[in-house]
Amino acid sequence: MGKPASRGFSARTRGWGHLAACSALALLTAACAQTGSPESASAALPRENFDYVGWDQYLGGSDSAQYSALDQINTVNVGRLEVAWSYPAGEGPAPQFNPIVVHGTMYVTTADGKIAALDPATGRELWKSEATGRISTRGINYWQSADGSDRRLVFLNDGLVRAIDARTGRYIRDFSVDLRDALPAGHADTPRPLMTSNPGRVFEDSYIVSLPAGSGYASHPANIQAYDIRTGALTWSFNVVPRVGEFGSESWPEKDRERFGGVHNWSEFTVDPELGIAFIPTGTARSDFYGGNRPGDNLFGNSILALDARTGKRLWHFQTVHHDLWDFDLPNAPKLMTITKDGKRIPVVIQAAKHGFVFVFDRRTGEPVWPIEERPVPQSDAPGEHSSPTQPFPTWPQPFARQSFTEADINPHIPQEDQQKLREMFRTVRNEGLFTPPSLRGSISMPGHNGGTSWGETAVDPLHQRFFVVSREIPVLNTLLPDSRPDVAANMPNGGPGIQPYNTPYNFLMQSNGMVAIKPPFSFLTAYDMNTGKILYRIPNGESWVLQQQGITGAGSQAPRGGPVATAGGLLFVGTSGDRTFRARDAASGRVLWEYKLDAATEGVPAVYEVGGRQYVTIPVGGEGLFAQKGAPAPGPNRYVTFALPAR
């Protein structure tokens, strides 16, 4: 057995931060008081008076629940769902957007970089904004003043934080923030706009967002910023790469410390509106697959950060991967609920990870609900690399994704020649299971950095304490290739002698017929009972287009992207991009109760809302999907498709 994460390592760099050495709640609370953790650590349970009826923010609300308390559409009548209306999104990239509905108006983005206001009951266009350029692809934010006189949509637009009047679509001219203005010294001359697909979050009168960061060695740190929504003034900033003297600074080399970057919250995050805590999952320190130049654990990379949403003060953290070499960043918004364990009610935050684990913490304190062990892992043989000797392994719940890929797992549905090439590959590469480091001869990573789960792919049912995860099975071959470009070496932060940069081309082991290398199922839908941590079901998520044409079912959609939404009607709505199907499942069993064939992929998150006493479900549709299989017909137009029960 491995050793608990709370023992044997510096509490400043391992496990759950300064709380790691505490075993009793009294000691834990004392440690919190000394180092700035939330005063609510020993307080009463939060009331959790969340509004699950509306859908006025990305993923439904700032709590990111992807849950609706509406139950007009339920397990009994869902089979009668029909298309109520659709709205064309225009030519261009497929929509990955999660619509919001506020004060009887739906807001969506279009392919030409505009925001459209729609009648949510009919899809009739009310207006289009004058915005041009790229807008955050996944979502936008709604804010209004206390008296409701000032109503704004806040979003990223070509690297600027912009706002438009939610009634008219006109720009608010005296509000604009260039994210480059917040870059630390040494990075302020970045010529390109800082743009991300992460929509950020509104909390009270602040807009919180992570600075974008590139994937190269010279990337700037993706600090987390908060801006006053009325004035655009910077109200606080949190350094994701700690500066000298800050907590976690010793997890980085002293040399070139100010030049290290990354640690980007590229996906999405959650704000608990009652506790006033922002739960922010972070990405990898740069570069993604080689860290010889950055010895140490590299806080706050690959961490769930609990920050005071009003001040930016760190309350607690947990690092899920030390010194990441696999691009195993945390890809989705943490989920909130209250569970009952050993007779006690615990308000938890739940984080699903790319490498297939589910991490569960008391969200007030950061204490793990189930033990997390530090276990020895394979070590790097790459020149100059300093891989971590151990990594955190949750002892419970069980993983939702496969974490190994061997010769026995080769896909039998790919050509024999491809199968033989894979067998030969296994004889030469490193393949020692999860956390096999990248190498010069190539290393298998399973699930790879595009496997496991991703943005928008988790949901909760807070009434039944269920947690849902959509995942995909995509092994990767990580091969380090020396990068001899002089400019790369010159710009590489170098925390040690004799270090040279390496490049790791993406190799998802896609085969000649367009299928992944691993045998089906290619994707799963997993449901957990969070009171016990047990898996309720783990079932294939959708179908493979190619195999379905051959009469083979139950293979799972290849690389679905976009998320589920649970409802009080006992349903789980989820689209599967590869087979172009939108389904309603029984949330308790996973059984398909209704499905609708679309003419294009679904890659966004559905929105569930009610207008005029009628419940609707809207899903963005467009494109052929990620890693589309060969032979599928050309996709239909980009659009938003809305379903409802027949009008009375």
What is the predicted role of each segment?
Residues 76-90, 115-135, 147, 161-191, ...:
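Extracytoplasmic/lumenal domain signature
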